[in-house]
């Protein structure tokens, strides 16, 4: 992601690799009368024991009413519902009959009570099974001082309020803790965290939406939000930050920040990263995946990520709210075609950023000096196709090991290396030999030659 391990790059560059939308997106859409024209995520979790993806979501029916001053957004009274779905593969979702709410004379539906919050996070360190799920719910308007109540649940459905509510109270200030995306347990900082719009944008020092972070050791005692990310001189003047979903991978924090362009009312995600969870870097200022291409696509206007990405089975699963309207004018223009639904974008877990080598001649990556534990070196790579027009060489990655005296080690030079040519994760070898255990704990550098290929990551085992 960054240059932390990189000493130099020659004829090679770091490239952002976009997440790919699943071809069946939207994966959760309106197909019941109680779901209206709006579906948006409340929470998405992966249950490793049951091997199920679980989603709590909201529904509603919106329309634009024309007034002398222009269209205004309205909600059909009583249309806002809460519901639940699950999936075995993350793509095809089932909406079970929960039998909890009556709708048009029947309880055969997947609706949940209005006072049933979606889980804010699942707590891996909770010793009380009845409190394994935590839900935090706003109780006041965003334009007034806001409070938040804490609820506990053993299963994500049956909730008990914390007796000391509220656990968050922004008074006397006008509160602004949302859009709120809970990270849950932060394994690097060893604390629970949430990211949010940290002040009401009209009252922020910049007069814009910005992203903050708050932390708690127990879900009850929260610190004041700290503003982390604000638009800078490289951004367009109409750029604001609507929300951020953050998660950790290896020793990095990764964030999907929602870029909001107020002129065209469009939202799209940008990938950012941090090594301490506080100072974030925006090296790759381009969409991590794109809005819908065609007018009327369910996500042609806005992509909101209000659920932390899930890492499972070697892939990152990003469930997002896609909308083809943002403003009352857009809602009025789309009419019956206006909708919000839930899409899915994925990518392999190490493939966020790659080092791309040249097609005609190899690019060279030289790492900083480091020591490792393990016996063998593995690379995760992708081989590009041969380009007849450029007469490019076949994909090829080779590795050289440099000792603490900055000289290539005998038998581990580039000319000794067995070339890696196919997409996937491969063990590195030199003349058929891969054992590096004698170098365990010794400072070394790697010199990696990359031609017509992408290098995603390397790891010692």
Name these PLM-found stretches.
Residues 1-461:
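Carbohydrate-active catalytic/glycan-binding domains of CAZyme proteins
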């Amino acid at each position: 992601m960054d240059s932390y391990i990189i000493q130099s790059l020659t004829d090679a560059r770091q490239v952002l690799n976009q997440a790919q939308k699943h071809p069946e997106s939207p994966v959760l859409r309106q197909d019941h009368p109680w779901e209206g024209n709006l579906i948006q995520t409340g929470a998405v979790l992966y249950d490793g024991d049951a091997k199920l993806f679980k989603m709590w979501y909201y529904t509603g029916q919106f329309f634009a009413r024309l007034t002398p001053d222009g269209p205004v957004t309205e909600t059909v009274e009583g249309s806002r519902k809460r519901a639940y779905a699950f999936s075995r593969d993350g793509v095809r979702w089932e909406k079970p009959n929960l039998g909890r709410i009556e709708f048009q004379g029947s309880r055969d539906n997947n609706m949940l009570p209005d006072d049933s919050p979606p889980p804010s996070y699942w707590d891996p360190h909770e010793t009380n099974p009845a409190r394994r799920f935590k839900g935090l719910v706003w109780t006041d308007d965003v334009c007034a001082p806001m409070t938040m109540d804490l609820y506990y649940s053993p299963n994500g459905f049956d909730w008990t309020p914390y007796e000391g509510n509220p656990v968050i109270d922004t008074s006397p200030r006008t509160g602004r803790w949302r859009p709120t995306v809970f990270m849950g347990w932060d394994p690097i900082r060893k604390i629970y965290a949430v990211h949010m719009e940290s002040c009401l944008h009209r009252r922020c020092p910049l007069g814009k939406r910005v992203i903050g972070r708050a932390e708690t050791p127990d879900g009850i005692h929260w610190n004041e939000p700290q503003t982390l990310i604000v638009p800078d001189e490289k951004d367009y003047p109409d750029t604001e930050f609507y929300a951020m979903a953050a998660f950790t991978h290896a020793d990095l924090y990764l964030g999907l920040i929602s870029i909001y362009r107020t002129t065209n009312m469009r939202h799209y995600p940008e990938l950012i990263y941090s090594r301490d969870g506080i100072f974030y870097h925006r090296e790759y200022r381009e969409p991590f995946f794109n809005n819908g291409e065609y007018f009327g696509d369910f996500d042609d206007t806005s992509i909101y990520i209000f659920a932390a990405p899930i890492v499972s089975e070697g892939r990152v699963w990003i469930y997002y709210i896609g909308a083809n309207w943002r403003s009352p004018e857009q809602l009025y223009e789309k009419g019956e075609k206006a909708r919000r639904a839930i899409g899915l974008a994925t990518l392999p877990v190490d493939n966020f950023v790659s080092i791309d080598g040249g097609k005609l001649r190899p690019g060279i990556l030289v790492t900083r000096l480091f020591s490792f534990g393990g016996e063998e070196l593995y690379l995760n790579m992708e081989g590009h196709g041969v380009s007849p027009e450029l007469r490019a060489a076949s994909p090829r990655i080779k590795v050289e090991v440099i000792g603490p005296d900055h000289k290539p080690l005998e038998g581990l030079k580039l000319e000794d290396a067995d070339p890696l040519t196919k997409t996937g994760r491969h063990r590195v070898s030199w003349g058929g030999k891969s054992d590096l255990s004698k170098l365990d704990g010794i400072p070394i550098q790697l010199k990696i030659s990359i031609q017509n290929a992408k290098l995603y990551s390397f790891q010692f085992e």
